[in-house]
Amino acid sequence: MALLCLDGVFLSSAENDFVHRVQEELDRFLLQKQLSKVLLFPPVSSRLRYLIHRTAENFDLLSSFSVGEGWKRRTVICHLDIRVPSSDGPSGPCRPPASHPSKYRGPRYTSHQGAAAGPRGAPAGRWHRGRKPDQPLYVPRVLRRQGGPVAASIPGIKGEDPAGAVSEEEPREAGAGDAEADQGIAMLVTQELLKSPDPGHANEPQMGLGDTEPSENPEKEQGAETAVQQGSGAQLAMEEENRSHGMRSLVDQEEEEIEGEEEEKVDEKEEDTGKQKERVDEEEEKTDAQEGKVDSEGERMDEGEDKVDAEEEDEDEADADHGDFSELLQEITANLTEKEIKIEKIHLDTSAFTEELPGERDLTHLVEIYDFKPTLKTEDLLATFSEFQEKGFRIQWVDDTHAIGIFPCPASALEALAKDFSVLKIRPLTQGTKQSKLKALQRPKFLRLSKERPQTDSAVARRLVARALGLQHNRKKELPTPPSVLPS
């Protein structure tokens, strides 16, 4: 039989034989002409699944897809008419349909373009530093002196009319160019404030041009005012004291009433607790008598539980198989337009091609750690297996209450299984849960046994370091001893 060529490479004899048998299965399935049937292959390696897909491509009326996870992934063959069309065609995500044209978005202006588009000096939403008005680089001294009267003409200063506050001789734009005028205004305002009388000394007699004559006896008037203020202050103090005494008496009465009520409640609670203690004592006596009966019944129940556990394990295995099949059925129907289908298994014996699949012999150095508190961390589990850490023991989490213990060799795993641990339990991974098995089989590095570090000495270490640094290791070569000359 001639070897087939795939992707420019000739297949091996075993793969060539496998492809020919798959072709025979597909020919037989196609001759049945039943659209409601699908052909299900057993779990095989990824390489063999790839060969099945490539073989199915040669049949125009058939389609193939894979279901399942990890080492349980399987290939399904169905008729092309009942296959759900994939979204990888021309109308897929790479090429959007014309019915959904892209929305046009106008050009985005930058901050400088937006400022130039609007009117100069107009605020946009929030305060922006506007562009300074054009100013001459040099202003003669004469023109700078002419700016003085503008600053002096401020309304409210030296009795000038507010209407004539702004000078008509220099019409300037109000902007950053009026810095000098603002400084002049500030100076004039401070001068006027310094000239004005201090408000703290307003009561002192001052003489001015338009001032009236001061009172003849200002000291007498001040004395009368202070006397009136003192009398009113004393009266207010007396009234406040009377009010405070009345409030204190009311508060004292309320506190006495509250204390009396609390004491009565405490006495009632003590009486209730005494009665409850008597009832508890009576109930404890009854429970002690009942516990004796329960102990005898518990021994009988333990014997029955052992039998029930064995039956439950068998039921769990059957439920797991049924659950796997139902999940596969859901995945298969999700890829088909026909929901009522019949699954047909192949007649091909794939036992000769499943040598590459992981089996129980590859999991002998792995154990499942279970039945421990969710609060335990990796450090706690490593501390429990501290005697195996030096040999290369590792832990891989599955969930909060399950983990995989990876030992360097099957002998170490058997040694750990023979021990009892107080805070957790362990068992071989082959007897573990489905999630733990999938976790281990999905990561091939778990299936590899860790190699022990080879024994080295100082000479080997120096040679390795020198080679890594690119240095030439000086080795003393022993020179051959010259032959001794015999005396004649």
Swiss-Prot record:
Residues 16-81 form the R3H domain. It comes from the Eukaryota. Residues 87-180, 195-322 are annotated as: Disordered. InterPro entries: Nucleotide-bd_a/b_plait_sf, R3H_dom, R3H_dom_sf, R3HC1/R3HCL. Residues 266-280, 287-301 have a biased composition (Basic and acidic residues). Keywords: Coiled coil, Phosphoprotein. Residues 244-321 form a coiled coil. SMART domains: R3H. Transmembrane segments: none annotated. Residues 114-125 have a biased composition (Low complexity). Residues 252-265, 302-319 have a biased composition (Acidic residues). One of its GO terms (molecular function) is nucleic acid binding. The modification Phosphoserine is found at S232. This is R3H and coiled-coil domain-containing protein 1. The gene is R3hcc1.
